[in-house]
Amino acid sequence: GATSVMIDGRVSALWHGGWSVGASWREGTTRARAAGLLAAGGQIRSRAWAIDAGKLGVFGASDRMALRLSQPMRVQSGGLMLHLPTSYDYASASATATDVAVPLTPFGREQVVEMVWSGPMLGGDLSINSYWRGQPGHVAAAGDDVGGAIRFVLGF
């Protein structure tokens, strides 16, 4: 098992003219409990953040456009301590185990840019979303991921 502590913070502001801005931050610490192969001393620090900007009334009175820059939750530092066999004595037929640090920090750092427009159209609601992800999954060698979606909702 493990014990995790997460701290979240968010600030936002609405301005005249339908403008809004916001920022969020999440910081976490996880400590693994010693059990089986897990040795005491493993600790992981993680972090995520996002910055948002939006505008209500871009092309009409009730449409909205927003932009988000973010980094999804990522291990910043730390890892697990494993109690593993590291040597073997053939004369006594016994293994010697020592605590080995296993780092869990990825080499990559995923970054995301998202843009969305939504508003009423043809008696329903239309939203158009596009995104770019650099180093998706926090994998340094991963190529960029680009995509989008169009959604139309019509109630009846």
Task: Tell me what each language-model feature is.
Residues 1, 6-12, 22-140:
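Outer membrane beta-barrel transmembrane domains
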Residues 53, 62-64, 143-156:
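Outer-membrane beta-barrel "beta-signal"
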